[in-house]
Amino acid sequence: MISSLKDSPLFRGMTGEDIECCLKCSHAQSVRYDKDEMIFCQGDAPEKLSVLIDGAVAVCNDSTDGRRSIVASIEKPGELFGEVFVFLGQKEYEHYAQAAVPSRILHIPREYFYSTCGKACVYHAKLIANMLAIFAQKAYYLNQKIQIISCATLRQKIAKILLEYGKAGESPAITMNREEMADFLNVARPSLSRELMRMQEEGLVKVTKRGIFVPDSLALRKIL
């Protein structure tokens, strides 16, 4: 578990020993979740910070017509989710988090971030400073998403998300499947699939079972 957390932005600049001490001091808990199991539900009280150890998590919101919208896809070990509600003092979550695959999650009590312990541990202060840096990065991410969904056409939205989150070359430009991508862009999946096929026919993208590839990023930029 410690090896997975070393790359987490929450524990940046900390040694393995520092992380172990931090987890003991905070009374953090590691919990396993099965695929599709709820990690927290909409309406639950946000009392603990959640960190992905391994697996993948979808943070979602359901519209009034029952359509699911993915707020965030958590796939990288050490990544946080639900922290905004934990530190805003909200009485309940407005979203829900669900394990996309069998996953292990670290839960750290919220109170640990509001005061330093009697030992005045350096790693405790470092953890709080890292949390502030994470909030700044999250604000930047949300700004990127707003720019993507604000694009005038579906083709522009697709081009924008591929350019923002992917790279041209041998690897897939994006790890989302079509359903997740449609949820992220807030569009119907059939509409997304049709546009992707048209873009593939024009040589703008290559759609395979492995993911969506970008042969030429410059061609995509001309769409914007």
Regions found by a protein language model. Name each.
Residues 65-71:
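Short alpha-helix-to-loop micro-motif enriched in aromatics/charged/Gly
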Residues 152-154, 161-224:
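Phosphate-/nucleic-acid-contacting segments
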Residues 36, 47-60, 77-79:
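Glycine- and acidic-residue-biased ligand/ion/polar-headgroup-sensing regions
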